[in-house]
């Protein structure tokens, strides 16, 4: 093959001359652009490029071995510790030339070892022969000297000398034999050591592609690096075997893959065998008893608190968490291992699995605090607590205003009561405490609280209006609280007043007047003119005497929260109705989730008071937060314990709420599948008092439908803050303020984010506007409206449109491009579109009643005489929330 130049070779390889020259230089051949290249040089270049482009020369393996170590802890619980052992090993792949070189070196090393072995053997033999000669010469010298020494002795000693000579010759021969055996043994050990070292080095450097998998390869993933891992395992075993303290250390060590399969007793016995190998004594088999699986289930006493997670319940029963989850699924409840479940569910699961359940009460601290109270002994008569209930605008507040001789109703927004007002009134016959409840439908929970805190219910019914829905609800609340009812028939001075109608309607709900044999007193009053007010007060006091109301006046007070709100200057304020004892300024009170010291007390007139007895409503300041309306108020001795109880109640409420929320059932799963199609109206609600927040939230949530849901993102008492505005911006919510306003920082966020902020003072307007917002999210309803009928009189053929129906418009108007139906014998046979509409060969847009026209139906030619063409249009009707 002729030589070619660098330029020609570069053109053949389709590369640049500079790149080819560089490649030759990398291969160790210096060339210029005009030099020629021989076939040998080309082959050298090709070998160099193949070696350069071959696969990676190094392979790095990283192995992680994970295991779990169970450490026993206190209380029968065990702690699991995850152990991870990481190993990293690098294998170098030799190229073929390197492999040949290593093979040649290996062969040379073997020959050198053989020659060294032979030389060592010959050297040992020479040394043994020389040693024997030296010993024989020394022996001969000693014999000669001995012979010269004893030459003058007597002849009778000759025999002993000869015997001694024979003995020493025999010893010399024995010594020579031992020296030869020692030399041979050393030679064999040296040869065996050299051969073992050579075999180990050869195995470390070999790269086998067709190695058989070892027994423990099933414990690892089969990958391309399987053989390398086997080599690593073999090397690890050799290293660890060298560290064993006895000959049986390697045999006694368990295999890698089966380290969890052997029992603890087997491992102890193996370790004992290793320890006993050094001293020549082997310890007997371990006397420790191995764990045997129990033949039957162990029934345990399981102590369950008010809430517990599934994992904790499994630990108490000494079973796996998956078994508890399976048992819960059999009972119809789905749970995860970290989910909090309530006490009843945990009891059912534990009893289902055959364990005995011990229910633990966690409110011992609370009971101890409540029992450590000085409540006094003697009970004294107290004033009745009267709640005025009734329908909206039936005159409840006006009636109470006349009694108090004030004008409170005009101060309420919209003239309706939106808070519970608590007042006490001194009369000639004694004191009466009045609670004025809202009558609007949204304030159901407020009325229920009023009924529970009261002794007597005054049911106000307008004589001209009769029994209304909230009147019925007030009757139900009174019956549920088992409170006597005094009926005040108001607006008796109106011409259209009909008291007998009121009696008849109330009798249907179990409220019978005394003259009809019932237990309820009926009093005719007029809040405007003041008619019958004294009779009403007398009836209330008479009913109170019948009830014999008594309370302990001395001692630590207890009562109920009627209303609560957050005042910007004073902080959390709670309206408290004292039931028993006397509440003093400076007392430590526990109120639901809140606690604190009474910093100040005010009566309903805003005057500072130092104490309040039974049936007296007061406003207290100094609580840690705004309590929920309806919470129990209790005076305790120790503020530290009160704080602990309040924090315990908060945690308990949070756990119970979480357990209730996470309790997922099968039927809810299918309901959640279609939630993506539901529109949501997000609202951030702030109001002036806690009762209004509760009432508005309940009312708005009741507006939710299947298509639009109302979601209260956040709610609270007090003004609208920057946090509320940020929350509304993040959740795309409407900011609603009920009798509150936004501060300066909140207004900046609202303007920057263009949030929808709305202020309300009347609950009617708030609910109506939320309804309007929800209505805008409803998809419109599509309705078909017939606009005209045309009767087919004759059918013509048209080359452009096909069958043309000659029609007479009998009703309405026929318009072009409107959808139509073709009716035959009042049965719809086709539904399509009107394509052509002509009158006297002129295209028209519409034909009115009584006119003739030609109609071409799009993609339909089976029009017959006598058919009726019905023209309609589709209109969208906006739906509203009822």
Curated annotation (Swiss-Prot):
Residues 415-419 are annotated as: G2. Residues 28-296 are annotated as: Disordered. Residues 490-493 are annotated as: G4. GO terms for cellular component: cytosol. The modification N6-acetyllysine is found at residue 800. Keywords: Acetylation, Cytoplasm, GTP-binding, Initiation factor, Nucleotide-binding, Protein biosynthesis. The keyword GTP-binding applies. Residues 526-528 are annotated as: G5. Residues 381-550 form the tr-type G domain. Residues 436-439 are annotated as: G3. Residues 67-81 have a biased composition (Polar residues). GTP binds at residues 390-397, 436-440, 490-493. InterPro entries: DNA-bd_dom_put_sf, EF-G-like_DII, EFTu-like_2, IF2_assoc_dom_bac, IF2_II, IF2_N, P-loop_NTPase, Small_GTP-bd. Signal peptide: none annotated. PROSITE patterns: G_TR_2, IF2. Coiled coil: none annotated. Residues 244-258 have a biased composition (Basic residues). It is found in: Cytoplasm. GO terms for molecular function: GTP binding; GTPase activity; guanosine tetraphosphate binding; translation initiation factor activity. PANTHER family: TR-TYPE G DOMAIN-CONTAINING PROTEIN (PTHR43381:SF5), TRANSLATION INITIATION FACTOR IF-2-RELATED (PTHR43381). One of the essential components for the initiation of protein synthesis. Protects formylmethionyl-tRNA from spontaneous hydrolysis and promotes its binding to the 30S ribosomal subunits. Also involved in the hydrolysis of GTP during the formation of the 70S ribosomal complex. This is Translation initiation factor IF-2. The gene is infB.
């Amino acid at each position: 093959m002729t030589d070619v130049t660098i330029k020609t070779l570069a053109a053949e390889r389709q590369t640049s001359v500079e790149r080819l020259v560089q490649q030759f230089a990398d291969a160790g051949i210096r060339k210029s652009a005009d030099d020629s290249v021989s076939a040998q040089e080309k082959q050298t270049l090709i070998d160099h490029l193949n070696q350069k482009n071959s696969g990676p020369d190094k392979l790095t393996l990283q192995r992680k071995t994970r295991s779990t170590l169970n450490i026993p802890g206190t209380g029968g619980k065990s702690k699991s510790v995850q152990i991870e052992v990481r190993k990293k090993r690098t294998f170098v792949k030799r190229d073929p030339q390197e492999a040949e070189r290593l093979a040649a070196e290996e062969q040379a090393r073997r020959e050198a070892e053989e020659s060294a072995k032979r030389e060592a053997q010959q050297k040992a033999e020479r040394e043994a022969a020389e040693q024997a000669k030296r010993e024989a010469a020394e022996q001969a010298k000693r014999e000669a000297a001995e012979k010269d020494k004893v030459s003058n002795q007597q002849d009778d000693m000759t025999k002993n000398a000869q015997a001694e000579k024979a003995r020493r010759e025999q010893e010399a021969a024995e010594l020579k034999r031992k020296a030869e055996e020692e030399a041979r043994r050393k030679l064999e050990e040296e040869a065996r050591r050299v051969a073992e070292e050579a075999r180990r080095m050869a195995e470390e450097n070999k790269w086998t592609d067709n190695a058989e998998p070892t027994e423990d390869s099933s414990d690892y993933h089969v990958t391309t690096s399987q053989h390398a891992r086997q080599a690593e395992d073999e090397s690890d075993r050799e290293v660890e075997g060298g560290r064993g303290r006895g000959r049986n250390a390697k045999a006694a060590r368990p295999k890698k893959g089966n380290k969890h399969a052997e029992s603890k007793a087997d491992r102890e016995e193996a370790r004992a065998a290793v320890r006993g190998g050094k001293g020549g004594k082997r310890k007997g088999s371990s006397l420790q008893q191995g764990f045997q699986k129990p033949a039957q289930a162990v029934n345990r006493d399981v102590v369950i608190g008010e809430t517990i997670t599934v994992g904790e319940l499994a630990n108490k029963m000494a079973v796996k968490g998956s078994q508890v989850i399976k048992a819960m699924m059999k009972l119809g409840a789905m749970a995860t291992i970290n989910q909090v479940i309530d006490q009843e569910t945990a009891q059912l699961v534990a009893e289902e699995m055959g364990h005995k359940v011990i229910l633990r009460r966690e409110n011992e601290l609370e009971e101890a605090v409540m029992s450590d109270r000085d409540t006094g002994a003697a009970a004294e008569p107290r004033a009745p607590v009267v709640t005025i209930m009734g329908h909206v605008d039936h005159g409840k507040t006006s009636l109470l205003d006349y009694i108090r001789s004030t004008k409170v109703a005009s101060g309420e927004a919209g003239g309706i009561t939106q808070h519970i007002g608590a007042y006490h009134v001194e009369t000639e016959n004694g004191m009466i405490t009045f609670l004025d409840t809202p009558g609007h439908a949204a304030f159901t929970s407020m009325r229920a609280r009023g009924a529970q805190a009261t002794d007597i219910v005054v049911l106000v019914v307008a004589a001209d209006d009769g029994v209304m829905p909230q009147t019925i609800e007030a009757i139900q609340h009174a019956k549920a609280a088992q409170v006597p009812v005094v009926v005040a028939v108001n607006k008796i001075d109106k011409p259209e007043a009909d008291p007998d109608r009121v009696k008849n309607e109330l009798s249907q709900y179990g409220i019978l007047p005394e003259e009809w044999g019932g237990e309820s007193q009926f009093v005719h009053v007029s809040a405007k003119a003041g008619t019958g007010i004294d009779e009403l007060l007398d009836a209330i006091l008479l009913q109170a005497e019948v009830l014999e109301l008594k309370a302990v006046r001395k001692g630590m007070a207890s009562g109920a929260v009627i209303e609560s709100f957050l005042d910007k200057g004073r902080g959390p304020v709670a309206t408290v109705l004292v039931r028993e004892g006397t509440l003093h300024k400076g007392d430590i009170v526990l109120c639901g989730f809140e606690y604190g010291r009474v910093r100040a007390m005010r009566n309903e007139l805003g005057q500072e008071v130092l104490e309040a007895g039974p049936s007296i409503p007061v406003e207290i300041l100094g609580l840690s937060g705004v309590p929920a309306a309806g919470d129990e108020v209790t005076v305790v001795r120790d503020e530290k314990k009160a704080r602990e109880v309040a924090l315990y109640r908060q945690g308990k409420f949070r756990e119970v709420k979480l357990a209730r929320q996470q309790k997922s059932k099968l039927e809810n799963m299918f309901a959640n599948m279609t939630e993506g199609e539901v529109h949501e109206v997000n609202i951030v609600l702030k109001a002036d008092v806690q009762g209004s927040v509760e009432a508005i939230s309940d009312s708005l949530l009741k507006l939710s439908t299947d298509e639009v849901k109302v979601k209260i993102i956040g709610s609270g008492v007090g003004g609208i803050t920057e946090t509320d505005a940020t929350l509304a911006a993040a959740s795309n919510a409407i900011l609603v303020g009920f009798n509150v306003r936004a501060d300066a920082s909140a207004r900046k966020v609202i303007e920057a984010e263009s949030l929808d902020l709305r202020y309300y003072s009347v609950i009617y307007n708030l609910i109506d506007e939320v309804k309007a917002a929800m209505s805008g999210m409803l998809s419109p309803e599509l309705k078909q409206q017939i606009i005209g009928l045309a009767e087919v009189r004759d059918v013509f053929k048209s080359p452009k449109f096909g069958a043309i129906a000659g029609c007479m418009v009998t009703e309405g108007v026929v318009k072009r491009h409107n959808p139509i139906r073709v009716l035959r014998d009042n049965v719809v046979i086709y539904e399509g579109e009107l394509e052509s509409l002509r009158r006297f060969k002129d295209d028209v847009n519409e034909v009115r009643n009584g006119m003739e026209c030609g109609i071409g139906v799009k993609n339909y030619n089976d029009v017959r005489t006598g058919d009726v063409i019905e023209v309609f249009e589709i209109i969208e009707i906006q739906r509203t929330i009822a």
